[in-house]
Amino acid sequence: MLLPRIPQLSHATRAAYVAAKSPFSPVPVRPFHASAALRAIDMAKVDTTHRLAELRKLMKERNVDIYMVPSEDSHQSEYIAPCDARRAYISGFTGSAGYAVITHEKAALSTDGRYFNQAEKQLDSNWELLKQGIQDVPTIQQWTADQAGGGKVVGVDPSVVTAGDARKLAEKIKKKGGEYKAIDENLVDLVWGSERPARPSEKVIVQPKKYAGKGFEDKIDDLRKELEKKKSLGFVVSMLDEVAWLFNLRGSDIPYNPVFFSYAVVTPTTATLYVDENKLPEDVKEHLGDKITIRPYEAIFGDVTALSKELFEANDKNETQKKFLTSNTASWALNKALGGDDKVEETRSPVGDSKAVKNEVELEGMRQCHIRDGAALSEYFAWLEDQLINKKATLDEVDGADKLEEIRKKHDMFMGLSFDTISSTGANAAVIHYKPEKGECATIDSKAIYLCDSGAQYRDGTTDTTRTLHFTEPTEMERKAYTLVLKGNMALERVKFPKGTTGFALDALARQFLWAEGLDYRHGTGHGVGSFLNVHEGPIGIGTRVQYSEVSLAVGNVVSDEPGYYEDGKFGIRIENMVMVKEVETKHKFGDKPYLGFEHVTMTPYCRNLVDMKLLTEDEKKFINDYHKEVYEKTSKYFDKDALTLEWLKRETAPY
């Protein structure tokens, strides 16, 4: 699953879930994804007149002239729970990216090009749509600052914006003569009232050491060593996947991501987990033992205020200047609770850095889950071809996505999807962030490109694979584009590079063959992936984002390799493999540096029908043949009683 080259606002999520019982834990756990029955988007306008009137009353009572409603939750999560979908509630717009700002006379909603059509359908007459990226249309920050002139107060819930973003916007507003102010109560929550969904309270499960590879005690010890190096008083863990990883726990509070609502505070002598205790079964409490203090989720702000005061007083007596560490994604509210910028040092999260370097157990888990997942994808593609070509079936894009999920569910340790499947036919495949919706999506066309970007959560790893197929006769341009993308995918996978190289530096390798033809794609080439955690994981990645120039790739990183090519209104192509960074042998070691390379773990054939053999070198053909041989050897055992898939797999993996 790709990340856009230009950073987008955080994704919102579906507003409902389906209860289910996981066979892999002793307690009921919801799936990590929205039900297929809930995929349809209601495009009807919501009358927001009353909601806005109530919000403006609250604004007036609190002397707020302008109120900002971002998409994010308190943890800057990519996906959010229904109770945190405040922007969707106040505006009626349910797209995954957007920012709402309300004044006493106006209301504006900013979103990007993926959602212009949806926003126009869903926003009522109370709202002005700011089309992000269109010439002469201001950003929501610029629009807000312009409205703040003349001493107006701009309010925001400080728990849903980062401290860094708050500083930047406060400066813009100040230059216009306004004031940016933290409003501790979330005013949209007050308007929402009793209709607001409850915060999820699903049970937490243990991620055993046989999957995690390392005990949580050792992880906390490693974090304390980092605190000692930085001479820090402690670290506040605010990202949900970081808390889950640090304590070897998983949850199901957020769709697609096996995390739970929580914070953690680690000091040189204490470790406290902030979570609703009723979410912790006895086995989880036994797992944590007496080394971890459990405190209520809501107690975090009061506790860090008291703790920071206590530690800073002791710090003053020692006449040493130490600060609390927070990640650069921590909220403004946490920053304020800890005493503000003078007492807080923002940094790239040391927990996030450690999490991105998988240990040998996690790496082996990634290998194994990708074999099972590859078998599921081959079964799906064989079934789909048979349905379309032999049975002349009529299937829409969601039918395909649902069938793939059904097949994945049969495999060991399946826990849910890792994101909503992108099942796209023809022109829809050219929409980079396409999401099929029942009742709105297209019928799969056997005479057109079919792009499937999908992934799953397993107890031993997280998968994300994209394959592009054609079931009949592709055009010459489709074959050429596919082969150029495939060449770029292979070039990146096969590169050897010195330790210290960044994903920013490697990005061009995947684009080189497209560039030679004057072609390109408008998204990043790769993103980090968690181990039974979030499918998008920082801080590493491959692309032109500034952050990818700041962090070098390291042994144990798992990252996607997914170049593509898209022609609007016609077709789209993307090929995505998951690769792991490993040390490699080279004849020389310039500067005595180790050299690194990639190991592929994705086990799904490329599409023979789309490969233009004339564009491949003999070396590239050998690479594909070796890969296909490995795919067949590792996945064919799943099809002893499935002649259809086995024949398809033999055909697709036959030597060139």
From Swiss-Prot:
- InterPro entries, from UniProt? Creatin/AminoP/Spt16_N (IPR029149), Creatinase/aminopeptidase-like (IPR036005), Creatinase_N (IPR000587), Pept_M24 (IPR000994), Pept_M24B (IPR033740), Peptidase_M24_C (IPR032416), Peptidase_M24B_aminopep-P_CS (IPR001131), X-Pro_aminopeptidase_P (IPR050422)
Query: What reaction gets catalysed by this protein?
Result: Release of any N-terminal amino acid, including proline, that is linked to proline, even from a dipeptide or tripeptide
- Where does the chain bind Mn(2+) 1? D464, E562, E576
EC number(s) in its UniProt entry?
3.4.11.9
Q: Which UniProt keywords apply?
A: Aminopeptidase, Hydrolase, Manganese, Metal-binding, Metalloprotease, Protease
Give the co-factor note: Binds 2 manganese ions per subunit.
Which Gene Ontology BP annotations are present?
Answer: proteolysis
- Residues binding Mn(2+) 2 are D453, D464, E576
**What Gene3D superfamilies does this protein's entry cite?**
Creatinase/methionine aminopeptidase superfamily, Creatinase/prolidase N-terminal domain
Cofactor dependence: Mn(2+)
**What is its EC class?**
hydrolase
Q: What GO molecular functions are on record for this protein?
A: metal ion binding; metalloaminopeptidase activity
Q: Which GO terms describe its cellular component?
A: cytoplasm
Q: Which PROSITE patterns match?
A: PROLINE_PEPTIDASE
Role noted for this protein = Catalyzes the removal of a penultimate prolyl residue from the N-termini of peptides.
For this chain, the family text in UniProt reads:
Belongs to the peptidase M24B family.
Under which name does UniProt file this protein? Probable Xaa-Pro aminopeptidase P
Task: Give the originating organism.
Answer: Pyrenophora teres f. teres (strain 0-1) (Barley net blotch fungus)
Q: Which gene encodes it?
A: ampp
